[in-house]
């Protein structure tokens, strides 16, 4: 944490972060929020030594134009801080669990075939850069791996060179969401792509650790995939033709999941039997997280809706059209 904590809650914030990291949680995002909370306390409650309801609820109050989902993410670490303080014998007010209201589930953009074709065609035109010698090789493979394997962008970004077995196609995903490792098997065409990529990049960075190296041969920072996406997507003709939320890098993962479900239905597969496999492949902790995609598949693919209505009528969740 480069920011120097300055409020009277500094020792407790440091203690909570240390506790989380000791048991294996990166806790990076929450640490940033706790840093902001420390600034908030230093500015508005510089003499406070007790985490009171007044301080906590002032922090928890919804800000102008703030989405309820971000409000939820902003409150959670402070609730954890109060619980940590109570656990070591220091009185602190715990923000009630019903604050804020239930999060609104994000409706992803499901890429169409023309959109995918246009995007991948565009990134394939990437030219070598004198400032980053491997970037023109990294970008096309990075996005194909995210889409073809349904990876979270961070999972692809943080791949190590040894995480993909070029002989078997076994890919190891380390410490992903929920801090769980998992193994993903690559399709033959994706594996062939990775082999060609590895051969070329290893000539540039023979001793690198990052599978997708930046200009120094190290891991890219978390903001780069979004930057790349908008760099290539925003000027495409198809970019302005969509309904709902604007596309994001993470939506390639959603598109993979929805298309996989539709493919299984077209093949006459039993979705009830296959859904747990998709859940494990995606690294979901709960099967309900995977059920989420069934609704989008039924909306996006008429064939899916027609064939699966009777087969999994009890499995398709009702749409929750809660408004922001």
Question: How does the language model describe each region?
Answer:
Residues 1-324:
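Conserved catalytic core of the tyrosine transesterase superfamily
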């Amino acid at each position: 944490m480069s920011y120097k904590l300055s409020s009277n809650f500094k020792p407790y914030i440091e203690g909570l972060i240390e506790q989380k990291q000791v048991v294996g949680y990166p806790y990076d995002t929450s640490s940033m929020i706790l840093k902001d909370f420390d600034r908030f306390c230093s500015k508005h409650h510089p003499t406070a030594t007790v985490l009171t309801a007044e301080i906590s609820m002032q922090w928890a109050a919804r800000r102008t134009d703030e989405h309820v989902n971000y409000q939820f993410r902003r409150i959670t670490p402070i609730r954890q801080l109060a619980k940590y303080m109570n656990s070591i014998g220091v009185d602190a007010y715990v923000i009630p669990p019903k604050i804020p209201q239930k999060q609104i589930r994000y409706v992803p953009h499901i890429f169409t075939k023309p959109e995918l074709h246009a995007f991948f065609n565009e990134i394939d035109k990437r030219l070598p850069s004198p400032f980053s010698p491997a970037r023109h090789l990294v970008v096309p493979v990075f996005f194909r791996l995210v889409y073809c394997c349904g990876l979270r962008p961070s999972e692809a970004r943080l791949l190590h060179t040894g995480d993909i077995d070029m002989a078997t196609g076994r890919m190891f995903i380390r410490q992903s969401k929920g801090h769980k490792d998992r193994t993903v098997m690559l399709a033959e065409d994706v594996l062939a792509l990775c082999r060609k990529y590895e051969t070329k990049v290893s000539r540039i960075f023979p001793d690198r650790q990052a599978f997708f190296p930046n200009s120094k041969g190290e891991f890219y920072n978390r903001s780069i995939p979004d930057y790349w996406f908008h760099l290539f997507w925003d000027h495409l003709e198809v970019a302005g033709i969509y309904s709902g939320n604007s596309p994001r890098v993470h939506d390639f993962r959603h598109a993979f999941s929805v298309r996989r479900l539709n493919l299984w239905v077209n093949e006459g597969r039993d979705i009830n039997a296959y859904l747990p496999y998709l859940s494990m492949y995606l690294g979901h902790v709960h099967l309900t997280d995977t059920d989420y995609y069934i609704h989008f598949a039924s909306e996006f693919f008429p064939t899916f809706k027609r064939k699966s209505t009777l087969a999994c009528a009890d499995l398709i969740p009702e749409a929750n059209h809660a408004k922001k």
